[in-house]
Amino acid sequence: TKNLIISAHYDSAEDSVGANDNGSGVAAVLELARILKDTEIPYNIKFILFSGEEKYMLGSRWYVGKLTEDERKQIIGVINIDTIAEKSDLGYMAMIEGNKRPDNAEYDDEGLKKLAELNKNSMSELFTPSDRFFLTMATNSDHYPFALVNIPAVSIVQDWQDGLNVNDSSDVKENMDIQRI
Protein backbone atom coordinates (compact mmCIF):
# COMPACT_ATOMS: atom_id res chain seq x y z
CA THR A 1 0.00 0.00 0.00
CA LYS A 2 1.25 3.46 -0.90
CA ASN A 3 1.68 6.06 1.83
CA LEU A 4 1.54 9.85 1.99
CA ILE A 5 3.24 11.38 5.02
CA ILE A 6 1.95 14.62 6.54
CA SER A 7 4.36 15.86 9.19
CA ALA A 8 5.45 18.64 11.50
CA HIS A 9 8.00 19.02 14.28
CA TYR A 10 6.99 19.60 17.88
CA ASP A 11 10.27 20.81 19.34
CA SER A 12 11.32 24.45 19.55
CA ALA A 13 14.54 26.41 19.82
CA GLU A 14 16.16 26.62 23.25
CA ASP A 15 14.89 30.08 24.24
CA SER A 16 11.51 29.79 22.52
CA VAL A 17 8.06 28.68 23.62
CA GLY A 18 7.53 27.49 20.05
CA ALA A 19 3.96 28.71 19.61
CA ASN A 20 4.37 29.34 15.89
CA ASP A 21 7.58 27.36 15.26
CA ASN A 22 6.15 24.87 15.40
CA GLY A 23 3.00 24.65 17.48
CA SER A 24 1.17 25.95 14.41
CA GLY A 25 2.44 23.07 12.27
CA VAL A 26 1.48 20.50 14.91
CA ALA A 27 -2.01 22.02 15.16
CA ALA A 28 -2.37 21.89 11.37
CA VAL A 29 -1.34 18.22 11.22
CA LEU A 30 -3.79 17.32 13.99
CA GLU A 31 -6.58 19.25 12.27
CA LEU A 32 -5.84 17.54 8.95
CA ALA A 33 -6.00 14.17 10.71
CA ARG A 34 -9.40 15.10 12.16
CA ILE A 35 -10.75 16.33 8.83
CA LEU A 36 -9.43 13.40 6.78
CA LYS A 37 -10.20 10.56 9.23
CA ASP A 38 -13.37 9.46 7.41
CA THR A 39 -12.25 10.34 3.88
CA GLU A 40 -11.69 7.50 1.44
CA ILE A 41 -8.34 7.94 -0.26
CA PRO A 42 -6.56 5.38 -2.47
CA TYR A 43 -3.49 5.36 -0.22
CA ASN A 44 -2.65 5.54 3.47
CA ILE A 45 -1.92 8.84 5.15
CA LYS A 46 0.60 8.74 7.95
CA PHE A 47 0.50 11.71 10.30
CA ILE A 48 3.91 12.02 11.95
CA LEU A 49 5.14 14.54 14.52
CA PHE A 50 8.93 14.67 14.71
CA SER A 51 11.22 15.90 17.46
CA GLY A 52 14.70 17.32 16.95
CA GLU A 53 14.04 19.50 13.89
CA GLU A 54 15.81 22.40 15.59
CA LYS A 55 18.83 20.09 16.07
CA TYR A 56 19.45 19.36 12.37
CA MET A 57 16.26 17.32 11.93
CA LEU A 58 17.29 14.50 14.26
CA GLY A 59 13.82 12.91 14.42
CA SER A 60 13.08 12.85 10.70
CA ARG A 61 16.65 11.78 9.87
CA TRP A 62 16.31 8.87 12.31
CA TYR A 63 12.92 7.91 10.83
CA VAL A 64 14.19 7.95 7.26
CA GLY A 65 17.31 6.02 8.29
CA LYS A 66 15.16 3.23 9.75
CA LEU A 67 13.09 2.81 6.57
CA THR A 68 13.82 -0.22 4.44
CA GLU A 69 14.22 0.25 0.69
CA ASP A 70 10.77 -1.31 0.20
CA GLU A 71 9.23 1.08 2.75
CA ARG A 72 10.82 4.04 0.98
CA LYS A 73 9.32 2.93 -2.33
CA GLN A 74 5.86 2.86 -0.73
CA ILE A 75 6.01 6.57 0.18
CA ILE A 76 4.43 8.65 -2.59
CA GLY A 77 5.36 11.93 -0.92
CA VAL A 78 5.88 13.99 2.20
CA ILE A 79 4.10 17.22 3.07
CA ASN A 80 5.74 18.88 6.06
CA ILE A 81 4.10 21.86 7.78
CA ASP A 82 6.36 24.31 9.60
CA THR A 83 5.61 27.76 11.02
CA ILE A 84 2.38 28.92 9.36
CA ALA A 85 0.55 31.25 11.77
CA GLU A 86 2.46 34.51 12.24
CA LYS A 87 0.35 37.68 12.32
CA SER A 88 0.93 39.72 9.18
CA ASP A 89 -0.52 42.72 7.37
CA LEU A 90 0.76 41.35 4.07
CA GLY A 91 -1.99 38.78 3.50
CA TYR A 92 -1.54 35.05 3.37
CA MET A 93 1.73 33.96 1.89
CA ALA A 94 3.09 30.49 1.42
CA MET A 95 6.57 29.31 0.73
CA ILE A 96 6.76 25.78 -0.60
CA GLU A 97 10.21 24.41 0.17
CA GLY A 98 11.39 21.43 -1.79
CA ASN A 99 14.65 19.85 -2.77
CA LYS A 100 14.72 21.14 -6.35
CA ARG A 101 14.39 24.71 -7.50
CA PRO A 102 12.04 25.20 -10.45
CA ASP A 103 13.61 26.54 -13.63
CA ASN A 104 10.96 29.21 -14.15
CA ALA A 105 11.04 31.89 -11.42
CA GLU A 106 11.18 32.51 -7.69
CA TYR A 107 7.61 33.83 -7.74
CA ASP A 108 5.21 31.49 -9.46
CA ASP A 109 1.79 33.08 -9.98
CA GLU A 110 0.75 30.21 -12.25
CA GLY A 111 1.39 27.75 -9.42
CA LEU A 112 -0.72 29.91 -7.14
CA LYS A 113 -3.57 29.98 -9.64
CA LYS A 114 -3.42 26.19 -10.00
CA LEU A 115 -3.61 25.75 -6.23
CA ALA A 116 -6.60 28.08 -6.03
CA GLU A 117 -8.31 26.22 -8.88
CA LEU A 118 -7.78 22.85 -7.18
CA ASN A 119 -9.62 23.92 -4.05
CA LYS A 120 -12.05 26.71 -4.82
CA ASN A 121 -13.94 26.30 -1.56
CA SER A 122 -11.08 27.17 0.76
CA MET A 123 -7.71 27.67 -0.90
CA SER A 124 -8.87 30.49 -3.17
CA GLU A 125 -10.01 32.45 -0.12
CA LEU A 126 -6.57 32.11 1.45
CA PHE A 127 -4.33 32.64 -1.54
CA THR A 128 -5.28 35.23 -4.13
CA PRO A 129 -3.27 36.43 -7.14
CA SER A 130 -2.20 39.51 -5.16
CA ASP A 131 -0.51 37.36 -2.54
CA ARG A 132 2.96 35.91 -2.93
CA PHE A 133 3.54 32.24 -3.50
CA PHE A 134 7.12 30.99 -3.34
CA LEU A 135 8.71 27.86 -4.67
CA THR A 136 12.18 27.52 -3.26
CA MET A 137 14.91 25.04 -2.49
CA ALA A 138 15.52 24.46 1.21
CA THR A 139 17.42 22.07 3.44
CA ASN A 140 16.26 23.22 6.85
CA SER A 141 13.09 21.31 7.73
CA ASP A 142 11.82 17.77 8.12
CA HIS A 143 11.05 17.27 4.42
CA TYR A 144 14.76 17.31 3.62
CA PRO A 145 15.86 13.88 4.95
CA PHE A 146 13.17 12.32 2.74
CA ALA A 147 14.33 14.32 -0.28
CA LEU A 148 17.89 13.11 0.27
CA VAL A 149 16.74 9.54 -0.45
CA ASN A 150 14.68 10.61 -3.49
CA ILE A 151 11.27 10.61 -1.81
CA PRO A 152 9.22 13.57 -3.13
CA ALA A 153 9.01 16.00 -0.23
CA VAL A 154 8.02 19.61 0.44
CA SER A 155 7.55 21.89 3.43
CA ILE A 156 4.76 24.44 3.58
CA VAL A 157 6.06 27.47 5.47
CA GLN A 158 4.90 31.03 5.97
CA ASP A 159 6.96 33.53 4.00
CA TRP A 160 10.17 34.00 5.99
CA GLN A 161 10.71 37.42 4.39
CA ASP A 162 7.83 38.62 6.54
CA GLY A 163 10.09 38.94 9.62
CA LEU A 164 8.78 36.03 11.67
CA ASN A 165 8.95 35.91 15.46
CA VAL A 166 10.59 32.50 15.80
CA ASN A 167 13.45 30.83 17.66
CA ASP A 168 13.36 33.36 20.51
CA SER A 169 11.11 34.65 23.30
CA SER A 170 8.82 36.45 20.81
CA ASP A 171 7.45 33.13 19.48
CA VAL A 172 4.29 33.29 21.62
CA LYS A 173 0.58 32.91 20.89
CA GLU A 174 0.07 36.69 21.10
CA ASN A 175 2.11 37.05 17.90
CA MET A 176 0.06 34.44 16.07
CA ASP A 177 -3.04 34.54 13.89
CA ILE A 178 -4.77 31.26 14.75
CA GLN A 179 -7.04 31.56 11.69
CA ARG A 180 -4.00 30.90 9.49
CA ILE A 181 -3.84 27.35 10.77
PLM regions and their residue ranges:
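Alpha-helical metal-binding/catalytic segments enriched in His/Glu/Asp
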Residues: 6-56
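Residue-level preference for long, well-ordered alpha-helices that form the structural scaffold
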Residues: 18-21, 25, 52, 104, ...
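Metal-dependent peptidase/peptidase-like ectodomains
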Residues: 52-155, 160
